[in-house]
Each structure stands twice: as structure tokens, then as C-alpha cells.
Amino acid sequence: MFALTAYRLRCAAWLLATGIFLLLAGCSEAKAPTALERVQKEGVLRVVTRNSPATYFQDRNGETGFEYELAKRFAERLGVELKIETADNLDDLYAQLSRAGGPALAAAGLTPGRQDDASVRYSHTYLDVTPQVIYRNGQQRPTRPEDLVGKRIMVLKGSSHAAQLAELKKQYPELKYDESDAVEVVDLLRMVDVGDIDLTLVDSNELAMNQVYFPNVRVAFDFGEARGLAWALPGGDDDSLMNEVNAFLDQAKKEGLLQRLKDRYYGHVDVLGYVGAYTFAQHLQQRLPRYESHFKQSGKQLDTDWRLLAAIGYQESLWQPSATSKTGVRGLMMLTNRTAQAMGVSNRLDPKQSIQGGSKYFVQIRSELPESIREPDRSWFALAAYNIGGAHLEDARKMAEKEGLNPNKWLDVKKMLPRLAQKRWYAKTRYGYARGGETVHFVQNVRRYYDILTWVTQPQMEGSQIAESGLHLPGVNKTRPDDDEGDGKL
């Protein structure tokens, strides 16, 4: 009897111990943090991306780029810091994303369509782009997919474009192409530009951001329908972070954040065209080095990015110190006599004085804008006022407010400026008629020149990298002695 009781007690103890163990194990498993909880606990959102003008790069003021700005807003939503990690190529990017303890997500202008997409998951899309076949101006233009046969083609290894070509090869077995993990989009466009390859495939947004550096490249045709860019997250069944990402992207689209970022980074990329791009590339090499030190000096004195000042100068005069217009404005920064006197400029044709005066005038205008206008919109408003005057700009802001738009956002106010040239609108304003449409183009052009200068002068683009890229970087390429300054008239 005693032995039986002891046996029962041992069994009960064993069952109790087993139950406690299973309970603890179950609690331990239940307490394993989700992907979202890990990010919040660490206080850091790790994001892997690519180094390119359409995604992420660093300039004098720090980190920037479309994907960087979007990821930064997402990190702010989560209440954590953003940590950017860069990948050498797409294969490296996806490898980092799939590795245990790797980044939380990839934000790199990705289009779903890779052959190994099963290893990752994609978010809702946030920007529509079109894959395009790129060729060199002067060569026979391909017009259909079968025209790719017999051409020297290179694309990014592991890209959706490589997957597209793999599908096309099933239809045309004789099609040949190379995939490379040692290049970026900039390199592929340069190779087409100089004739090292015949064709490449890139997305429309990548081309828009880079075409100005390579004026010989052209779009042959769209290679398929438009598709959306998305963020990539590691595979698995943990939806915590994915749900938060999708909610953020949906809200960003609904509340206008995506539109503002598109306007900032892509809203002004089509204003140059072939002739403008080719001419600007020449002037970067031949003219700007003569005046670069003056722009830098003014920028330092006025605590303003010298490249923005240089962009204004190019829009005004094409960096010609003797430029003159029919209205009497003169010099590299095209100052009126009244403005020159107010800024202490005694000789408008002296490039150093003109740059100092124009720069001082721009910064003064910017400082006088309402405090409710914040950067980067503040600089765009200042450019508009520099061109059209503060009074007319204020008319456009009031018009925007009456239309239910935001008078402190350039994206909204620029829609109103062309109305200042239409009687049914300007008749209701305080200051009357103005060529507001020209002002919109002025701001677009300056922004485009500024973007180019920002990219080609970023810190990592130095030395041999510049030579290899083929970009015309002021201060590096030598000025040609036979450069024609022109007759000084616009």
C-alpha cells in the first residue's frame, strides 16, 4: 500500500514537473518578440538600400534621397532612429535582408519580379514606374522586343529587368545579355552613352534622375506595363512590421506625403530636354570652375548651399558675367540696377560682385518669408519671389488658400501662379497681372540644376570615381582655353 502510494506520488510529481516545463516553454515561445516589437525595443529601424540619386546618397548637408526621406518618415512614425545600410548590388541587398539579424526592410526602388522573390515579401506599392529599353542617340532605334536580338545588352544582376530578359529569351533563344553585380544604373547609362554597350533596361524614375548626366541616351520603347515600386521585408509569417509598413504607405499616399516627395525628387526632372542637358554638361566643365570659388565664398558667408546659388546663376545667365537682357538686368546673377545698389554692387558685370549681390538678395528674400513656410518649400518660395517678386507670390498664396490648398506648400502654390496671367483671376488680386507660369518654370529649372550639382559634388564622388563615371565635375575637369563665352545676350 505504501509502495503504491509512493509510486502515485512520483507519477504526480513527474506530471507536475512536465506540466510546469511545458507551460514555461509555451510562455517563452509566446513572449518571443515580433519583428515590430524588436524594432521598437532596439529603438532603431535598420534599412538597407542602394547608393544612387534616385534612392539614397549623402551631400554636404547629410543623408538625402527619395527612399531615405520616406524611410525616415516611417522611422519617425515608429518613434525610433533610422539607420541606413548600403548594399554593393541587388544580390547583396537581398542577401542582407534574408540573413538572420539583418536589416528590418529594404527600401531601394525595388520592383517585384526577381526570380527568387519567394525569399522575401513586398509591401504595398508607392510609386509607379515603367521599365524602358535605353539606346544611344545616333544608333538604330529598337522598336520592339525582337529587335534586342544581336545587341550588346547589360542589366543589373538579380534585377527585375534580368528576369524580364530571361522570359524574353524563352521566346527568342538567340537573345544574349549580360548581368553584372559590379555596376549601378549610372554605370549602365554611361556605358550606353559612350557606346560600350548597345542597350540596357532601367526604370523610368532612374532614367529621369540620371539622363542629364548622359545626354546621348534615349528611350527606345517601354518594356512592358508600368508597375509599382515596393519595400521588401524578410520572408516568413510575421506580419507585424509588414502591417505597419503598409498602413504607413497607404497613409502617406492619402495625406499627400508621397506626392510631395515625388514633387521634390521627380517633379522637375523633365525640364531640360536633350539640348539643355548637353549644354549644361558642357558648361559644368567649361564655365563653372571660373566662378565656383565665388559661389562657395558667398555660400559660406550666408550659410547657404553654394550649389543652390550656382543653380540660380546658371538659370539667370548660363554663368555668363556679361549677360544682358532687354529689360536692363545685367551680369551673371542678372541684377536690376536698383537691386544692385541695394546689395552694395557697384559693377554688375564683375562676376564676384554679381554673385555676392545676387546671393545676398536671395537669402534676404528667404529670410523675409512667413515663418509658417518651412524648408525645403521655403527655398522654392524664395526662388519664386526672386523671380516674380514677393507681392505677386503673396497673391498666389492667398489664391491657394481660397481654393482650400496649403499656402505654405510649394506643390499647391505653384498651381496658382499661372493664374496670375489670366484676367479672370488676376483681376481679383491686389497686385494684378504677372507672368506666373514663367516663375514656375524658373523654379523647376533651378531645382533641376541644383539636383545635378548636388549629385556630382557629393563627398563619395571624388578622385578616380569621377573619372570613371564620366561626369563633368566642376573643380576637377580642366577648363578648355577655347571655350566661347558668347556675346553676353540671352
UniProtKB/Swiss-Prot annotation:
Region (Non-LT domain): 33-269
Subcellular location: Cell outer membrane
InterPro entries for the chain: Lysozyme-like_dom_sf, MltF, Solute-binding_3/MltF_N, Transglyc_AS, Transglycosylase_SLT_dom_1
A UniProt-annotated Pfam family: SBP_bac_3
GO terms under cellular component: cell outer membrane
Active site (catalytic residues): 316
Catalysed conversion reaction: Exolytic cleavage of the (1->4)-beta-glycosidic linkage between N-acetylmuramic acid (MurNAc) and N-acetylglucosamine (GlcNAc) residues in peptidoglycan, from either the reducing or the non-reducing ends of the peptidoglycan chains, with concomitant formation of a 1,6-anhydrobond in the MurNAc residue
Keyword vocabulary terms for this entry: Cell outer membrane, Cell wall biogenesis/degradation, Lyase, Membrane, Signal
Membrane topology reported for the UniProt record: Peripheral membrane protein
Family under the similarity heading: In the N-terminal section; belongs to the bacterial solute-binding protein 3 family. In the C-terminal section; belongs to the transglycosylase Slt family.
Designated name of the protein: Membrane-bound lytic murein transglycosylase F
Lineage: Bacteria, Pseudomonadati, Pseudomonadota, Gammaproteobacteria, Pseudomonadales
